[in-house]
């Protein structure tokens, strides 16, 4: 859609993925790889290096990616996925604020500062790089804005078919801890095996596929499984929001984590209506 209004977004939110083609205007839309390299080539970023199904976490200066990106293959690539760089390099966030539709109603800033989530995630991937199949922490409503390059997507709603992904539950590592749900076998929806999984999934649930380019952003509904692949060198900024449509899921997911971590404490029963009931 183009020029989605606030009322239209409120009516949609939490139901289906949507690609917003226009309606975002910020200095970061002028960023290109060469400009980013000149400004932040000496900044260290957290990244993932892939060789086949092996993944290795590392950190390097951005300038090193200039050489690495020329030697990538479908089985060997690099993906910068840095949650904290906007705190270390504030001008990145200043030049690239969250999409207005998501920022208009966001309850996360109401939390105490020490447990607020990182406001944005810096994502810079070489050609062929891809995320895991995962669900975002807290079941928040996510966004992914492409500044340059192109990113392909597959999204699947939650349901009884979740076991197709062999999901593992780990800890998110965010300031306010939560569970993180992630496919464990390094499955790619774009692989031969992944296409077979999608064929089975389509018999049980809707599967959405699409792509976004410069200036476009995807809104990811609360609780949906998704995976992204970069078809060329691609810079994107991911964000999140807790709003009237998803705050029940966010609270429920927070309580679920702390119930698990603090078993000796008597927790109130949480109902999907968004209220705490006396046990």
Model-derived regions: residue spans:
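N-terminal accessory scaffold of Fe(II)-dependent oxygenases
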Residues: 1-217, 225-279
């Amino acid at each position: 859609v183009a020029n989605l209004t606030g009322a239209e977004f409120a009516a949609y939110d939490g139901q289906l993925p949507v690609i917003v083609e226009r309606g975002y205007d910020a200095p970061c839309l002028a960023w290109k790889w060469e400009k980013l390299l000149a400004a932040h080539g000496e900044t260290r970023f957290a990244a993932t290096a892939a060789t086949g199904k092996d993944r290795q976490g590392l950190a390097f200066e951005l300038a090193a990616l200039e050489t690495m990106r020329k030697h990538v293959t479908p089985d060997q690539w690099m993906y910068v996925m840095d949650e904290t760089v906007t705190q270390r390099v504030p001008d990145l966030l200043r030049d690239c604020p969250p999409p207005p539709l998501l920022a208009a109603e966001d309850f996360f800033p109401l939390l105490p500062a020490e447990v607020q989530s990182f406001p944005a995630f810096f994502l810079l991937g070489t050609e062929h790089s891809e995320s895991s199949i995962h669900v975002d922490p807290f079941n928040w409503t996510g966004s992914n804005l492409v500044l340059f390059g192109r990113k392909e997507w597959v999204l699947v709603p939650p349901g009884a078919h979740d076991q197709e992904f062999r999901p593992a539950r780990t800890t998110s590592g965010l300031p306010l801890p939560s569970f993180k749900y992630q496919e464990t076998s390094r499955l790619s929806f774009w692989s031969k095996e992944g296409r077979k999984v999608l064929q089975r999934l389509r018999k049980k649930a809707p599967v959405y596929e699409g792509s976004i380019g410069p200036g476009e952003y995807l809104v990811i509904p609360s609780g949906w499984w998704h995976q992204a692949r970069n078809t060329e060198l691609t810079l994107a900024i991911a964000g999140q929001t807790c709003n009237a449509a998803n705050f029940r899921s966010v609270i429920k997911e927070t309580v679920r984590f702390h119930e698990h971590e603090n078993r000796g404490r008597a927790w109130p029963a949480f109902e999907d209506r968004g209220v705490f009931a006396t046990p």
